[in-house]
Amino acid sequence: MEFHILASGSKGNSTFIYDNGVGILIDCGIARKQLLYKLGNLGFQESNINYVLLTHDHYDHNKNISIFDQRICFCGKGCIKGIDSSHEIKPYKSFQLAHFEIMPLSISHDATSP
């Protein structure tokens, strides 16, 4: 499994996890150009992103969520307007993305759905 922190800080956050041909982008708070540049430096491209998870609705985490098809996006309630309810993440309710088991946790943070 590969785990790459692409950006961290108040100007943008993004992490990329890749394992057995499946890529998950956690947060997309950086510009698309910057995202593609950073992925490219690691030997990946946009097509390697199979799923996008948003941790919460702050701009430094979701700035460029609109570049992704909502069918691959998963987030807490209220983070993406109009997202299918089957893609809403609920704290402590695990779900599968390919061979990954995701267990969302609830934390204290000033956000709609942290």
Describe the residue ranges of each PLM region.
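Short, flexible loop segments at the rims of nucleotide/cofactor-binding pockets, characterized by
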Residues: E2-I5, G29-A31, N50-L54, P104-I107
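Active-site metal-binding motif and surrounding structural segment of the metallo-beta-lactamase
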Residues: K33-G78
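Catalytic core of the metallo-beta-lactamase
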Residues: S94-P114
